[in-house]
A protein has these predicted regions:
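Peripheral docking tails and interdomain loops at the edges
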Residues: 324-336, 444-446, 466, 619-680
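Long, well-ordered, tryptophan-enriched scaffold segments
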Residues: 15-19, 196-344
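Cofactor-binding active-site loop characterized by glycine-rich and histidine/acidic residues
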Residues: 63-183, 357-358, 362-363, 371-372
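Structural signature of the thiamine diphosphate
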Residues: 237-311, 432-437, 456-506, 661-680
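Non-catalytic terminal/interface segments that mediate subunit docking, oligomerization
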Residues: 87, 302-304, 308-415, 421-431, ...
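A glycine-rich helix N-cap at a beta->alpha junction
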Residues: 107-117, 182-195, 427-439
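Glycine-/acidic-rich phosphate or pyrophosphate-binding loops and their flanking alpha/beta elements
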Residues: 257, 284-287, 317-320, 339-354, ...
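N-terminal amphipathic, basic-rich helices that act as targeting or association modules
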Residues: 2-102, 264-265, 275-282, 299
Length: 680
């Protein structure tokens, strides 16, 4: 970014080495307390907030960069608007830490942890929080709806939508903007928080237009002179500086009359660009809005990671989202481990080198989903569509029609946004599109909107779709390789967030399934067989595995999927004294394989373990297939109930849901009526 594109550089850096005591921030109990401060004190408050954020988020992890960039903006909003009457709608919501601090929530010691503050807006925390979903581009539609409701009910007050330039690329934002312009009345303010980035630099035609608005040399030169010369020359100079802001719109039109034309043509009054780190300038712009009776868009220029050198100099994402770090250096505290995303990144690049027809798509998340290495080696074969998952899916269908095999890498919870396109654009047209679904299952600290728990149930409704759930590095590589060979239907490869487990080798392959563990034929209670000590013959059938000592024991088949493979093996071992157990990994969950249906017929019970919804999920699909095939083996399904999960660690959530080895063993014994031999 050119120097002229940045807000004016002032002394704003956070002193992380000593963390001096906070003097003003602890006095802010409600936004009304901000009215007691002059602008010099407000600037000091902004510095204290940045120090607090760096020190606090360094201990818990969270969205640091976005919040460092909106400190002055949030202060100014709370100074001019009244949250007891006006409504703030924060798009995505990851930039609301400052809002929380100013509305009485200053205990960040357990941020994003069980019992602590959410990392996103939360109505349970405060009436000032409205939009909780944390999925981008929805704020303008929400704001439009609230403004319409206010008019119908005769309620006063403004609706303020704060949306980033990245989220502004989403189709929902433009659909809402079209409706707002058509109505063209009401107290509705859109604050376009333009830092040139979402996770990475914002792309597309809108980004180019906003770049043009940022770079107006004459305009920037005039305002910079006013800031440097007038604000430092006492009360008279400040008065003149305010006058300069009063003439700002005219000055802008004189030096660059095309600015804001895109929004003006839509019927939205455009103001800006405004320095998002100048509280006085922001307050002046917001105050002018109060006299309007029609929607207004204020274009605010901010700097992601502002005031914290490690974030400012981190080119990849300016500390968009971090784990625990050393606040003085920004270096991570926890050692890095090889993660699922890195395996995907390595394997898709390997496959692309062998097949030039493989192309990749992302929705503004090139680095988080692991496509950056692909982009570096094959820049013409990666397409970033912005925050527009539905567009990505339909674009993938077009690429498939054109003879390529698109791989769309996306977070599981964001795949929900492209369901219609998956169904009608990809599946209906038998398009060979592979979806690599990162962060599937319970993710934890980011709360209800980020758990990737809906995908299997949704995907099960799509005709022809095939879905795989790898259990470790080797199976991720294998199943991704199998997926890109399918050229007449959509495929999904789902994998969780975080570090890889140790390798989980199979005893053998039976049809399409991997056998992971089984009670050996004729064994005494508690004996077991693992791949590392296996002497089982390849191709052994369920009938062959029965021994004289095991025939009397009830037969239990455990289908443990993906990240729950090791859990299934632990459960199987614990039940080996009471059941003749086999633990399998189905590998491909959808459609349910005929091999699994046939195998189920030879068992007294089938247990399914899945890191997804129980209702409509893998277990439900097995139950349906068995019924269709006149196989009446009972199916006991374990997974995530149909509810929104509060933020906590993944382990805490799984324990609460009873998805631990001990809890599952007790439940299976209870539901089957088979008591433990040791307890008998």
């Amino acid at each position: 970014m050119k120097e002229s594109q940045n807000p004016e550089k002032r002394e704003h850096h956070t002193e992380t080495s000593s963390f001096p005591a906070l003097k003003i921030l602890p006095l802010i109990k409600t936004p009304r307390d901000l009215q007691k401060l002059n602008h010099r004190q407000l600037d000091r408050l902004a510095g204290e907030i940045r120090r607090f954020l760096v020190q606090s988020v360094a201990q818990t992890g969270g969205h640091l960069g976005p919040n460092l960039g909106v400190v002055e903006l949030t202060i100014a909003l709370h100074r001019i608007f009244d949250v007891s009457r006006d409504v703030f709608v924060f798009d995505t919501g990851h930039q609301t830490y400052v809002h929380k601090l100013l509305t009485g929530r200053q205990d960040f010691s357990h941020l994003r942890q069980r019992g602590g503050l959410s990392g996103y807006p939360s109505r349970a925390e405060s009436d000032t929080d409205v939009l909780e979903n944390s999925h981008a581009s929805a704020s303008l539609a929400w704001a439009d709806g609230i403004a319409r409701a206010n008019r119908l009910a005769g309620r006063p007050g403004w609706v303020v939508a704060v949306i980033g330039d990245g989220a502004f690329t989403g189709g929902m934002a433009w659909e809402a903007l079209n409706n707002i312009a058509a109505e063209n009345e009401g107290r509705l303010l859109i604050v376009l928080n333009d830092n040139g980035r979402s996770y990475a630099p914002t792309i597309g035609g809108l980004a180019h237009h906003l770049d043009a608005l940022r770079v107006t040399p004459q305009y920037e030169k005039a305002l910079k002179w006013g800031k440097q010369t007038l604000r430092g020359s006492g009360p008279v100079g400040n008065l003149v500086y305010s006058g300069l802001h009063a003439a700002k719109a005219g000055l802008r039109d004189m030096v660059s009359p095309a600015e804001g034309a895109l929004f003006d043509e839509l019927g939205i009054t455009y103001t800006g660009p405004v320095d998002g780190h100048d509280i006085a300038a922001l307050e002046f712009s917001f105050t002018r809005v109060l006299a309007s009776t029609k929607p207004v868009l204020i274009h605010v220029i901010t700097q992601k990671g502002r005031g914290y050198t490690p974030a400012e100099t981190n080119i990849s994402d300016h500390f968009h989202a971090i784990g625990r770090i050393h606040p003085e250096t920004g270096l991570p505290i926890d050692p890095e481990r090889f993660e699922w995303t890195q395996v995907f990144a390595d394997e898709i690049l390997h496959l692309a080198r062998r097949d030039e027809k493989i192309v990749a798509l992302t929705a503004a998340m090139l680095q988080p989903v692991g496509l950056l290495p692909f982009k570096k080696q094959f820049p013409n074969r990666v397409f970033d569509v912005g925050i527009a998952e539905a567009d990505a899916m339909a674009t993938a269908a077009g690429l498939a029609y054109g003879g390529y095999h698109p791989v769309f890498a996306v977070y599981s919870s964001f795949l929900n946004r492209a369901y219609d396109q998956l169904l009608m654009d990809v599946a209906l047209h038998h398009a060979g599109v592979t979806i690599c679904e990162d962060r599937s299952g319970v993710t934890g600290p980011d709360g209800a909107s980020h758990n990737g728990m809906w995908d299997i149930a949704l995907a099960a409704t799509v005709p022809g779709l095939r879905l795989a759930a790898p259990r470790d590095e080797a199976t991720l590589r294998d199943e991704l390789g199998e997926a890109v060979l399918v050229d007449n239907a959509p495929t999904i490869v789902r994998y969780p967030k975080g570090s890889l487990p140790d390798p989980i080798p199979a005893l053998r392959r039976e049809g399409s399934m991997d056998v992971l563990w089984e009670s050996p034929a004729g064994s005494s209670a508690g004996d077991s067989t693992r791949a590392s000590q296996s002497n089982a013959e390849d191709g052994a059938t369920d009938t062959q595995s029965r021994g004289s000592g095991a025939e009397a024991a009830p037969r239990l088949l455990i289908a443990a999927t993906g990240a729950f493979a090791k859990l299934g093996m632990d459960v199987g071992e614990s039940l080996a004294g009471d059941f003749n157990v086999k633990v399998i990994d189905p590998r491909w969950l959808l459609p349910v394989a005929s091999d699994l249906v046939r195998a189920s017929a030879g068992y007294d019970w089938v247990v399914t373990l899945e890191d997804g919804l129980v209702d409509g999920g893998f277990g439900s699909q097995i139950r349906n297939r068995l019924a269709e095939s006149n196989v009446f083996t009972p199916v006991l399904s374990y997974g995530i109930p149909k509810q929104f999960l509060s933020h906590a660690t993944r382990g805490e959530i799984l324990e609460e849901l009873g998805l631990t080895s001990e809890a599952l063993v007790d439940s299976i014994r209870s539901r089957t009526g088979v008591l433990s031999v040791q307890k008998a």
